[in-house]
Amino acid sequence: MAGFGLPNFGQLTEAFKKAKQIQQDAQKLQDELENMEIEGKSDDEMIKVWISGNQLPLKVEVQENIFNSNKEQIEKNILQAIKKAHELSTTTMKERMNDLTGGLNLNLPGFDNSDS
């Protein structure tokens, strides 16, 4: 510590460098998540959906013979596929954010920090 309870200039400069690096890495991660295509499937694989690492829907694939099923089964399959894709996407985002922050507990909204 320098005089008056302030950190020395070298420590302050290093802290700013680290903050700038985290900011750059966060932008890179944002771009990476945006370009990901994460697939979720219904249990019977009749419905597949893809969402980005940012949880944006990208596309849906439906097997032709799904239309032989009843309405409730089709709805169930769609929901299963969406839930699985969303779960994989949020897990991926949390893991990548944890990698970025080095396990720091930043208490970011939308992230469960109790895992850290």
From Swiss-Prot:
Predominant subcellular localization, coarse grouping: cytoplasm
Pfam families xrefs: YbaB_DNA_bd (PF02575)
Any GO MF annotation of the entry: DNA binding
PANTHER family: NUCLEOID-ASSOCIATED PROTEIN YBAB
Database matches in HAMAP family: DNA_YbaB_EbfC
Entry function: Binds to DNA and alters its conformation. May be involved in regulation of gene expression, nucleoid organization and DNA protection.
Annotated protein name in UniProt: Nucleoid-associated protein A9601_00191
Biological source species: Prochlorococcus marinus (strain AS9601)
Lineage: Bacteria, Bacillati, Cyanobacteriota, Cyanophyceae, Synechococcales
